[in-house]
Amino acid sequence: AWSQATKKHIKTSLTLYIRSMQKQLAPMGYHYRADDIEGKQHLEHVIPQNKIINAYLHGFITAEQALQMPLCIISDSDKHLLEGDWQQSGNWQYPFRRYQSAGYTKTIRSVDGRVIDMQKHTLDGHFAMLGIKA
């Protein structure tokens, strides 16, 4: 059996690798972008990265899905809105709903320019946009 330190090292390394690959694989380094970004930008994991890693490690999602999870550019000044508890408003099927419940009101568009309906946009729809089987 591996020590806790070894397990932690593996998970940290895996997280860094996945984060770097997610940015490389996303069409423009991201999949979604908020309108009216002022000042510094923040690349947001629509589903928190720790949730993605744990889901992958427990076999709930494939490696391809983990590497292609939605990334959204928002204003750095807005990121505090989304730092709330994923447990309360997190939703794998409808990942943007937590933006709504956090009070985020800016329009978000996909890389192909379509406005995202935060209430209805699904993770399956995200993967379909990328041509990935959900």
Residue ranges and their predicted role:
Residues 65-92:
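Short Cys/His-centered divalent metal-binding micro-motifs
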Residues 1-38, 84-134:
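Nuclease and nuclease-like effector domains acting on nucleic acids or nucleotide cofactors
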Residues 35-67:
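Histidine-centered nuclease catalytic patch
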